[in-house]
Amino acid sequence: MPHVITRTVCAAGVDAVWAKLKDIESYPTYMTVVRSVEIERELSDGRRVSSWSVLLKGSVLEWREEEVVDEASRTLSFAQLDGDMDVFTGQWRVTAESGGTVITMEATFDIGIPLLAEMLNPVAEKALRDSCVQIASAVGAQAHA
C-alpha cells in the first residue's frame, strides 16, 4: 500500500498550530480543497468520529473516520471507517523545532482497485501529498494570522 509523508514548516507557535490543526470543522472556511467536515460524535477519551468531503485532483473524495486526539503528544491519528478508499489511515503531528513549528502528516492508503493500482497509485499518492501540504500550509497560515 502506498505511504505518504509530508513535512511543512510554519512560523506560528506550536500551541497555535496545534489548536488550528485539531479544529477540523473550521477547515472549509479557509481551505478550498476541503468541501466539508463534520464531527459526528466526540468521546471523553479523545476519540471522535468525523465525516469528510474533499477535492482530490478535481474529484470529490468522501469518508468517515475515527480520530484520536492526543493533547500530550500533539498528534491526531485517524482511520477510515467507511468511504471511497478501501484503506485510509494516518497521523498528523505538530512539533516545535529550531526552524519553526513542523506539521508532519503520514498516511497509508489503498484505493481498492487492484487491477488499476499500478497506474492509479502514483497519481493518488501525488494528489494526497499535494493536498496534505495545502492543508498543513493553510493551518500554519491561519495559526500565524
Question: PLM ranges: what are they?
Answer:
Residues 108-131:
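A short acidic/glycine-rich loop-to-helix N-cap element
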Residues 2, 12, 52, 79, ...:
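Residue-level detector of alpha-helix boundaries and kinks
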Residues 22, 89, 115-119:
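Generic recognition of short, well-ordered alpha-helical segments
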